[in-house]
Amino acid sequence: MTLRLNELAPAEGAKREHRRLGRGIGSGVGKTGGRGIKGQKSRKSGGVRPGFEGGQTAIYRRLPKFGFTSQIALKTAEVRLSELSKVEGDIVSLETLKAANVVRRDQIRARIVLSGEITRAFTVQGVALTKGAKAAIEAAGGKVEE
């Protein structure tokens, strides 16, 4: 038996029939429409915001603050060794990485990490490196200038 797109249907009992609320006693959900009697949640725009605990100090206020987002980390691009092959020429700097679209234009610093293979020798200028990346570049015949 083949399955055709025009024969797709939800499983039996997976979809419930919509109940019209507030339409008489016989419907089972007349008058208050399943909302109970009085109170904030029975009103038309009733309801509490997410995280509200009925006036009790909420969990996000009971727990201490922690950590922060480093702005330097947001402006530092991580470049893999394998991405260096996109750079034209032998010199790798922040400007050449931006020109090759390896690093976004708004990044103010970059760091080369040991990931992937290096295809040719490069001279790295003014870009941070991890120990492993530095060793891999020097092993391939490249050099690192601070």
Swiss-Prot record:
Recorded superkingdom: Bacteria
Record field: compositional bias (Gly residues): 23-37
Gene Ontology annotations for the cellular component aspect, listed alphabetically: cytosolic large ribosomal subunit
GO biological process: translation
Single annotated GO MF: structural constituent of ribosome
UniProt region (Disordered), positions on chain: 1-54
Keyword Calcium: no
This protein's record includes keyword Membrane: no
Keywords: Ribonucleoprotein, Ribosomal protein, RNA-binding, rRNA-binding
SUPFAM superfamilies on file: Ribosomal proteins L15p and L18e (SSF52080)
Annotated InterPro entries: Ribosomal_uL15, Ribosomal_uL15/eL18, Ribosomal_uL15/eL18_sf, Ribosomal_uL15_bac-type, Ribosomal_uL15_CS
PROSITE patterns: RIBOSOMAL_L15 (PS00475)
Family that this chain belongs to: Belongs to the universal ribosomal protein uL15 family.
Job description of the protein: Binds to the 23S rRNA.
Quaternary organization: Part of the 50S ribosomal subunit.
Listed name of the protein: Large ribosomal subunit protein uL15
Origin species: Acinetobacter baumannii (strain AB0057)
